[in-house]
Amino acid sequence: MSYTLKVVSSPRDEREFINLPKQLYKATPQWVCPFDDDIRSVFDPARNDSFNDGEARRWLAFDEKGTCVGRIAAFFNRRTAMLDNEQPTGGCGFFEAIDDRELAFALFDVAREWLAENGMEAMDGPINFGSRDQWWGLLVNGFEHQPLYANPYNPPYYQKMFEEYGFQTYFNQHTYARGISVGTLSEAVYARVKRLEEQPEYRFEHIRMEDLERVIEGFRTVYNKAWSMFTGVQQMDEAHARGLMNTLRPILDPELVYFAYYNDEPIGFFIMIPDLNRIIGKFNGKFGIINKLRFIWDLKVAKKVDRAFGLIFGVTPEQQGKGVESGMIRAFEKKVEEGTLPYTTLELAWIGDFNPVMMRMVEKFVCANRHKQHVTYRYLFDRTKEFKRCPSLALKRRERPAAAAPAPNTATTTEK
């Protein structure tokens, strides 16, 4: 069958781009329809800072009957295309297609050709045009599970399409999961936590919204100590920390955000949010006033979200390896034991295999198991060039790295 490709250039085209997955996944119960505006905002120069130094283009594919059967986007960021890369590298993403090899290859071709015309020599995919904590990677394991909010879900046949075209694994991203009922930590971990709890210098507690200013500064302090030891990681300023917290504030549950203190100084944090995918699927991408009211009711009143989404955690270097990570998890468990929280499971996403220290820490001290796997692929336009996988996250100095997860914007590859 022959296909016609069309550049997205009108409001009607954009609606086709947004609505295609709704048709492809209508019989897939695990898939959760994202908010239309979440996708639309990625390609809006007024709302996506990546356009300050880059460009993006989208295509639709139509069959002989005029039915939309595929889509793809390609993009590049001039500021970061060479960062930690041996060649200028762009990206492709938001790929969707019926199960047809010819169609998939046509979409990959048009993305590759456009990127090459703009000076790129490789493309990563499927990725986001912006932050790595959304729409990044191809699901290759865990199809039976519902995705976390803004995490990709796709059918199994996509893996074959990417790999047969010539994409190679640049890095893997693991999602870990664990129950949060009593007794889900190992005996060794409970013993470590008990030793800390017996020392009055240590304290573990959830935040209070009235103390948000103190939380912002504590978060920034720990983050900068925990992550400044990694190459390529910038210090977080107050404006960035405040912006992050203000973004999360509407959905924050203070009993999902924990800090560890030593002599009243912050030494660790663990930030979770309610996983919105538990309640937004029924909205079919729409978020008008009625759905906003339903959303608030389900989240704040009915408390229908039973899954916590671990966004990021960190421990200062001098406290790493002492059980502080487990202490914060145990504080959360104790809150769950009171019976006032609806959460029964915790998932931690975007833990890259380029950071084996973090993987070991999550498995050993958080007692979480691998639950899903996504792959970030890379395709080199020069097919004779040697392919190299993403290098492990390097340290600036000899101290052991602080625990942190998923910190999606601090990997050794760059945002495209």
Region annotations inferred by a language model:
Residues 3, 152-232:
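Acyltransferase donor/substrate-recognition loop-hinge adjacent to the catalytic core
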Residues 176-193, 375-415:
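C-terminal "cap" of GNAT-fold acetyltransferases
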Residues 80-166, 283-365:
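Acyl-donor binding region in acyl/amide transferases
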Residues 65-67, 116-118, 251, 261-265, ...:
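Secondary-structure transition/capping motifs at alpha-helix termini
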Residues 11-14, 34-45, 53-63, 68-71, ...:
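Catalytic cores of nucleotide-enabled group-transfer and carboxylate-activating enzymes in metabolic
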Residues 14, 68, 78-81, 131-133, ...:
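Flexible loop/turn segments at secondary-structure boundaries
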Residues 21-64, 72-82, 206, 210-314:
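A conserved beta-strand-loop-helix scaffold within acyl/acetyltransferase catalytic domains
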